[in-house]
């Protein structure tokens, strides 16, 4: 905390310690804060800052800026993963100094690093290590990172074709999101991550009906929360499932067109290329 910012602001407004503290705390409390660094209660500090027409966060300028930069970088990594731009995600991950992360940021970093490694088919032992750090003391870790760790481990086992173990972890993740309350756009993304990859697993083992149930749930969540970034991948997997289930060709084509539209909206070039290949196969009647 940079107390000098507080003192400078008080002096800029021409307030004495007595005038500023009036109705909030004793002048002695304010003096101990300004002269000796004895921080008062958050309630008192908030009221003092309000009287100075400033936010408490302004007393932590370097931390606030650093956190903001790191959070934006983590946001970008998460979006790269959704957009299937795994190499870009990996480069950003490499640029992060873990020593500068808060506890919440470190949890998020571990989940993102684990997913990037897994989706790029890197060493499974490393991926397990990242996810297991989140599970090692799950009583302290935010619930969303627990169900994301379960999903990541499910993906590892799916890639190994160890489907019984994969299903065990995907089911644990699904069970957790059933009781999870979505409170932010970030929460939407993480719940959709579970649903999408669990649906991918069930499609892989040819349980298309189960996969579709999860995907339709994802479509509903996107609609309720007005987000589109996962819709392209959800619609494309629905199209693939419909194709494998030998649904009406018109339905498959409509789903693939929807997927392409959302992929263009979200600038997902990787998925657009996959959709084009799929649509060419449909056109040839393969």
Regions found by a protein language model. Give the residues of each.
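Structural motif corresponding to the intra-repeat A-B loop/turn of tetratricopeptide repeats
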Residues: 83, 120-121, 153, 160, ...
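Short alpha-helical DNA-recognition segment
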Residues: 13-32
């Amino acid at each position: 905390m940079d107390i000098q910012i507080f003192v400078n602001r008080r002096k800029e407004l021409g307030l004495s310690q007595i005038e500023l503290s009036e109705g909030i705390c004793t002048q002695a409390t304010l003096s101990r804060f300004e002269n000796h660094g004895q921080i008062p209660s958050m309630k008192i500090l908030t009221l003092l800052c309000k009287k100075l027409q400033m936010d408490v966060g302004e007393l932590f300028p370097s931390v606030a800026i650093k956190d903001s930069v790191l959070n934006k970088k983590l946001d970008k990594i998460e979006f790269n993963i959704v957009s299937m731009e795994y190499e870009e995600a990996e480069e950003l991950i490499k640029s992060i100094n873990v020593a500068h992360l808060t506890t919440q940021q470190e949890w998020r970093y571990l989940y993102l690093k684990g997913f990037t490694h897994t989706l790029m088919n890197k060493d499974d032992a490393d991926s397990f290590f990242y996810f297991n750090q989140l599970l090692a003391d799950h009583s302290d870790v935010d619930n969303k990172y627990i169900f994301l760790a379960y999903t990541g481990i499910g993906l590892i086992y799916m890639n190994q074709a160890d489907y019984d173990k994969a299903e065990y972890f995907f089911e644990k993740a699904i069970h957790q999101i059933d009781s999870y309350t979505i409170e932010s756009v970030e929460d939407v993304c993480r719940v959709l991550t579970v649903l999408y990859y669990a649906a991918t697993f069930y499609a892989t083992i040819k349980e298309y009906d189960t996969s579709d149930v999860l995907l339709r749930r994802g479509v509903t969540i996107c609609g309720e929360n007005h987000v589109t970034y996962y819709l392209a991948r959800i619609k494309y997997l629905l199209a693939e499932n419909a194709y494998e289930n030998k649904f009406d060709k018109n339905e498959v084509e409509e789903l693939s067109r929807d997927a392409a539209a959302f992929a263009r909206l979200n600038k997902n070039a990787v998925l657009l290329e996959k959709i084009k290949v799929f649509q060419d196969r449909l056109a040839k009647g393969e």
